[in-house]
């Protein structure tokens, strides 16, 4: 389950995009519509702040779909109360990412420390390939 900061990194950088491309054939990359819209909201300012088109990326979030699938509210709303209870006051705006992870039993890929301690496996970019390279459970 991708957080908005991972979507931004995938759009503006190379490392996250490379990881997604490398594992796309065998992994499913999902994000709630709220994280997608949050990334869309912040990207123009980030592109402008950098004053250049970063490494050939144009800041266009839509270049990620596919391989990233955007989930609608009906997927994560049933787990919303559990997600809000777990993420608490840390960042209540992130509850949809956590709710998706809870509803679908997926880990979260983020750089945001607010997801740690929520009861869902949480991976940062520097460690996520360990997850992708683990042998599948029998």
Residue ranges and their predicted role:
Residues 23-26, 33-82:
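PIN-domain endoribonuclease scaffold, especially VapC-family toxins
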Residues 69-107, 111-113:
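Active-site neighborhoods of divalent-metal-dependent phosphate/nucleic-acid chemistry enzymes
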Residues 58, 89, 129:
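Divalent-cation
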Residues 7-8, 37, 115-117:
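Short, active-site-adjacent cap segments at secondary-structure transitions
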Residues 30-32, 102-138:
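Acidic, PIN/NYN-like endoribonuclease modules and their adjacent C-terminal/linker elements
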Residues 1-31:
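Short, well-structured N-terminal submotif of metal-dependent ribonuclease cores
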Residues 14-18, 43-45, 123-124:
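Short, glycine/charged-enriched secondary-structure capping and boundary segments
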């Amino acid at each position: 389950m991708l957080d908005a900061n991972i979507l931004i990194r995938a759009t503006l950088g190379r490392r996250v995009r490379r990881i997604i491309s490398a594992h796309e054939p065998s992994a499913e990359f999902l994000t709630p519509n709220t994280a997608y819209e949050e990334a869309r909201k912040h990207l123009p300012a980030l592109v402008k702040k950098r004053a250049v088109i970063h490494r050939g990326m144009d800041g266009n979030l839509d270049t990620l779909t596919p391989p990233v699938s955007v989930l609608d509210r009906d997927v994560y709303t049933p787990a919303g109360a559990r997600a809000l209870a777990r993420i608490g006051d840390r960042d209540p705006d992130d509850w949809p990412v956590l709710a998706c992870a809870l509803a679908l039993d997926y880990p979260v890929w983020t750089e945001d420390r607010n997801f740690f301690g929520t009861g869902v496996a949480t991976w940062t970019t520097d460690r996520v390939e360990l997850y992708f390279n683990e042998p599948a459970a029998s």
